[in-house]
């Protein structure tokens, strides 16, 4: 169903996706390449391209745990070094877009799943996240959510200035940076 992810995935069967994903990740990392699992918390079962609009995953937490999150749990257990956040609306988890959601980035990925590696956003110019927010506010929201790398912020200078202002004002803790 997914217009963008379908051809870039290992399929629809969670066990095959998990096995192929683990083998691919292990091969990359054994070869000295940082593997990146994406698009957390699961972009496969959507019909909307997040480059153009915000996809919605209307599923229950139970469904998310049993299907979408299943391969990510396995990748984390087996030492994946990086996870890319997708721009998704998942009402069962939070009202904010997943890539700028503290409950999803820090609460679910870091605390609940125990991921200790690098978290990167998908491109912050994509309509899935940029439709209703300015570049600088998106960058700040992603940082506050717990993201380590902001991929392709729209206005880089404004984003840097906003993050710097947040650090200087105490809105964000410079020690966390």
Regions found by a protein language model. Name each.
Residues 1-11:
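A glycine-rich phosphate/pyrophosphate-binding beta-strand-loop-alpha-helix module
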Residues 12-172:
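Second-shell residues forming the walls of enzyme active-site clefts
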């Amino acid at each position: 169903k997914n217009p963008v992810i379908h051809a870039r995935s290992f399929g629809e069967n969670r066990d095959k996706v998990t096995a192929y994903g683990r083998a691919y990740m292990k091969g990359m990392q054994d070869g000295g390449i940082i593997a990146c699992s994406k698009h957390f918390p699961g972009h496969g079962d959507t019909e909307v391209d997040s480059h153009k609009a915000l996809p919605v995953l209307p599923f229950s937490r139970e469904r998310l745990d049993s299907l979408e999150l299943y391969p990510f749990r396995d990748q984390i257990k087996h030492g994946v070094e990086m996870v890319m956040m997708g721009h998704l609306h998942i009402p069962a988890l939070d009202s904010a877009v997943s890539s700028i959601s503290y409950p999803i980035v820090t609460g679910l990925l870091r605390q609940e799943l125990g991921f200790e590696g690098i978290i990167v956003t998908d491109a912050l110019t994509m309509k899935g996240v940029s439709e209703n927010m300015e570049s600088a506010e998106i960058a700040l929201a992603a940082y506050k959510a717990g993201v380590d790398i902001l991929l392709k912020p729209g206005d880089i200078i404004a984003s840097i200035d906003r993050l710097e202002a947040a650090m200087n004002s105490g809105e964000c803790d410079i020690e966390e940076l």
